[in-house]
């Protein structure tokens, strides 16, 4: 039955395994064009508050849950989740066997789907879904990015000025940057690099965002224009566009990573971080270039599975034609996808997961301190004990 706004919506159905944090999930711009299935059986128990929003508008195509709570209980709650969705025009459905749906997605991959309160003929809906355009055909970044620049002040003393390319940036990321002393000037996704550099920043940040990184060539060009000129940091889509700029390739994952419990090994420390993730695409590390054997434990040929490196506790290095040596710093222990890279011959690094969490664990918040250290000129800027960022 309907659990949100009346109407119908089309998109690509994915699943998120987080037990809590539904407000942050539905307000994450990275979900633009997607029908989000929440695997946890009961959703909405603590309502909607005024502090956890990750964007002003909701970008997801729709929400799929098993059991929706209509009478939430929490001291911060101002309204129920179904009321919130209805007010924002988001179509939602409940009484769905979300775990069975998740298994279907895992077996068949993310697929086109629809939710409708108006067309109740399954055959008609299926035909219209099949005729709908795939998510990769649309530039969702242009939909969710800011239209004008804005400035977010540093929390406390301003140590650095950062330009942040808004490809769908979550509010939690800007807050993390501000917390490490960064004054953040957020600019639209298609801002020419010369305009960003004219602001005389100490570093440039490329944010998370929705969709296929191949649909945003202006952002890739901006990355190329910034690399080597000043410190660069990227998260999620930011990691993907940095990878493309460096000459690597990006592939679509079968069903993506969406949730707050993805184990990632930090190859520099050998520690495992439990991370929050939300992406459908990932870089293909071997396409960056050939291995540098003397910096890769003597290995000369790329392994078929990057967990080869986590089993050895080795952070391999490749030689990129454009930017020299690039190190693999993080690997996903579930499927072996690359989760982080570091440029060794210029000041830049990026991560595929979300170190700010929102929602999720705080194992990786050190990434923002690392960016500040990079702008300070610290050579071993990533040498931070992950336990420093953990706050329970």
Predicted feature residues:
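RNA-binding accessory domains that recognize and position tRNA/RNA substrates
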Residues: 1-194, 198-199, 213, 322, ...
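Residues that mark the start of a beta-strand
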Residues: 159-163, 183, 231, 274, ...
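Cysteine-nucleophile active-site neighborhood
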Residues: 203, 207-288, 361, 370
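Proline-centered loop/turn at the N-terminus of a beta-strand
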Residues: 91, 161, 231-233, 249, ...
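Catalytic beta-strand/loop cores that center a nucleophilic Ser/Cys/Thr
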Residues: 271-346
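Short FAD-binding loop at a beta-strand-to-alpha-helix junction that anchors the flavin cofactor
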Residues: 347-353
């Amino acid at each position: 039955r309907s659990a949100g706004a009346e109407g119908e919506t089309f998109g690509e159905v994915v699943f998120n395994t987080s037990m809590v944090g539904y407000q942050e999930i539905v307000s994450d711009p990275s979900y633009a064009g997607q029908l989000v299935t929440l695997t946890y059986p009961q959703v909405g128990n603590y309502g909607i508050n005024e502090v956890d929003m990750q964007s002003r508008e909701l970008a997801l195509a729709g929400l799929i849950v098993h059991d929706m709570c209509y009478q939430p209980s929490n001291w911060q709650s101002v309204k129920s989740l179904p009321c919130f969705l209805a007010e924002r025009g988001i179509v939602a459905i409940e009484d769905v066997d979300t775990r069975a749906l998740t298994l279907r997605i895992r077996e068949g991959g993310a697929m086109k789907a629809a939710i409708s309160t108006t067309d109740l003929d399954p055959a008609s809906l299926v035909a219209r879904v099949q005729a709908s355009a795939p998510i990769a055909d649309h530039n969702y970044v242009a939909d969710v990015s800011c239209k004008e620049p804005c400035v977010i002040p540093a929390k406390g003393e301003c140590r650095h000025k950062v330009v942040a390319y808004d490809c769908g940036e979550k509010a939690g990321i800007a807050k993390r940057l501000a917390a490490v002393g960064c004054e953040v000037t957020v600019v639209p996704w298609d801002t020419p690099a010369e305009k960003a550099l004219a602001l005389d920043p100490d570093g440039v940040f490329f944010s998370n965002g929705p969709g296929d990184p191949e649909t945003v060539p202006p952002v890739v060009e901006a990355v190329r224009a910034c690399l080597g000129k000043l410190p660069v940091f990227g998260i999620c889509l930011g990691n993907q566009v940095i990878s493309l700029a460096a000459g690597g390739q990006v592939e679509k994952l079968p069903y993506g990573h969406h949730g707050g419990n993805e184990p990632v090994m930090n190859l520099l420390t050998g520690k495992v971080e439990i991370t929050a993730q939300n992406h459908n695409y990932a870089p293909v590390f071997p396409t960056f270039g050939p291995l540098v054997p003397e910096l890769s434990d003597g290995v000369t040929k790329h392994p078929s599975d990057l967990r080869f490196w986590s089993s050895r506790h080795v952070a391999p290095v490749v030689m990129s034609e454009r930017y020299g040596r690039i190190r693999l710093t993080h690997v996903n222990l579930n499927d072996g996808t690359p989760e982080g890279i570091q440029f060794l011959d210029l000041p830049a690094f990026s991560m595929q997961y979300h170190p700010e969490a929102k929602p999720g664990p705080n194992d990786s918040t050190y990434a923002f301190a690392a960016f500040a250290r990079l702008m300070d000129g610290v050579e071993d800027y990533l040498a931070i004990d992950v336990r420093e960022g953990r706050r329970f």
